[in-house]
Amino acid sequence: MFRGSIPAVITPFSENKVDYDSLTKVLTHLIDNGSHGLVPCGTTGESPTLSHDEHKKIIEETIRVTDKRIPVIAGTGSNNTLEAIEYTEHAENSGADAALIVTPYYNKPVSYTHLTLPTTPYV
């Protein structure tokens, strides 16, 4: 489904806030230089340190800037299963092509039942 160079996108900050103008420049640079897809909000993009609003806006901005020219694989993983589901549903509803969901780190679910929580077919 995916092939080629699909970099994890850094999240630029300025004065302790996400710098969305610089994010647009980074995304444009990656697209203009031949990336075959983009992965915003992975751990390289500082996802564990982002607020929920920042996380969602970065996904939305990436989808807007790519404008369907290349796939967007949204980083939606979290230690919190319900948060991962929320991020994944948001990514799907915003137009992401796929989601990158990491296995919970630092703590683990006590059983497989967390996998039976309501999700969309997108997960």
Where do the PLM segments sit?
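Residue-level preference for short coil/turn positions at secondary-structure junctions
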Residues: 1-2, 68
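Onset of an N-terminal alpha helix
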Residues: 2-3, 20
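Generic N-terminal amphipathic, Lys/Arg-enriched alpha-helix
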Residues: 3-14, 41
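Active-site beta->alpha loop and helix N-cap motifs at the rims of alpha/beta catalytic domains
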Residues: 14, 20-115
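Single conserved hydrophobic/aromatic residue that forms the stacking wall/gate
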Residues: 114-123
